[in-house]
Design a protein with these regions (language model features):
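Short beta-strand/loop segment that forms part of the nucleotide-sugar
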Residues: 55-65, 87-91
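N-proximal low-complexity "stem/linker" segments adjacent to membrane-targeting elements
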Residues: 1-49
Length: 182
């Protein structure tokens, strides 16, 4: 039990240190959205709370081809908050190919990975050209249709920010943990 108590103390101190780092920092939070209005609306509360943890914050949203009201939602967000930047466009492309001739899961196909990389380059353009890289200290990329985020987890990461340049979330695929999907 002594070790557990020491761990809890270390964890609390690290979260507190993260809060201090965040409160002195400028952040850009980047999201890509398509046909996820319901989940995105739920996560906007978290994103708003996360933004308040920083001295300054920007929210960059890249939206494409939504037909469920997501496009209209993100456009209204930009209209009401000068710290929100929206890049919305239509490609007419399918989200995922139905089936690959090679048998590869379409979620991990070259087609989808290339498309997602191009979309991510769009928010990098917004960061570089519209916001300015000198105006931010950190970039957080969030998948806004994830079921739940941990604010303490993010604070904990910032509490150790002297040890890292990049932090990546641990996700789970439908195929199980530690399954090589590529």
């Amino acid at each position: 039990m002594k070790h557990l108590s020491a761990y809890k103390q270390w964890h609390a101190e690290t979260v507190s240190r993260g809060e201090e780092v965040m409160a002195q920092s400028r952040v850009a939070i980047c999201c890509m959205v398509r046909d996820c209005r319901s989940a995105f609306e739920k996560n906007l509360k978290f994103i708003d709370e996360l933004r308040t943890c920083f001295n300054e914050s920007k929210l960059v949203i890249v939206e494409n081809d939504s037909t469920d009201g997501t496009k209209e939602l993100v456009q209204s967000l930009e209209d009401h908050d000068g710290g929100i930047y929206v890049d919305t466009f239509d490609t007419g492309e399918e989200t995922l190919l139905k089936k690959m001739k090679s048998g590869v899961n379409p979620s991990f196909s070259y087609h989808r990975v290339e498309k997602m990389a191009n979309y991510r380059n769009r928010y990098l353009r917004v960061l570089n050209e519209d916001i300015g890289l000198d105006a931010i200290d950190w970039v957080i990329m969030l998948d806004p249709d994830v079921v739940k985020f941990s604010l303490d987890g993010i604070k904990h990461s910032f509490g150790q920010s002297s040890c890292w340049d990049v932090v990546h979330a641990n996700g789970r695929s439908k195929r199980g943990l530690f399954d090589d999907v590529y």
